[in-house]
Amino acid sequence: MEHPRVVDPRHPLVERVRAVCLALPEAVEVEAWGRPTFRAAKPIFVHVSASMDRPLSIVLKTDPDEHQALTQDGRFFGPPYYDRDRWVGVDLDQPDTDWQLLAELIETSYRQVANRRQRTALDVLRPEHADG
């Protein structure tokens, strides 16, 4: 069954997320459930519009050590249908959207699901953030 599109995949905010995601090694975009998803090969690291109520939002996987702080920040929400102990959602269309923070969180999410080869390739691009 084909799902209806929830958000215009060419919306400028989605394009901004796309640019960050596709700059990561071997990242691909796959439309699933009528929404753009970004994957490190197969595992999803960013899901656009995971909630029907929030079409201009993304859901991403967090670092376990940072998760609690993010959930206490009013800009983030616990997304439905996701493990709320590891995933958070954030609205993209808010005036206080911090795009630098989102880029860092997207990279963290990618690192959570990427395989060793992909993480090594990212470490070459960003040695200051290497997993040491």
Language-model features and meaning:
Residues M1-G132:
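Charge-dense, helix-prone N-terminal extensions
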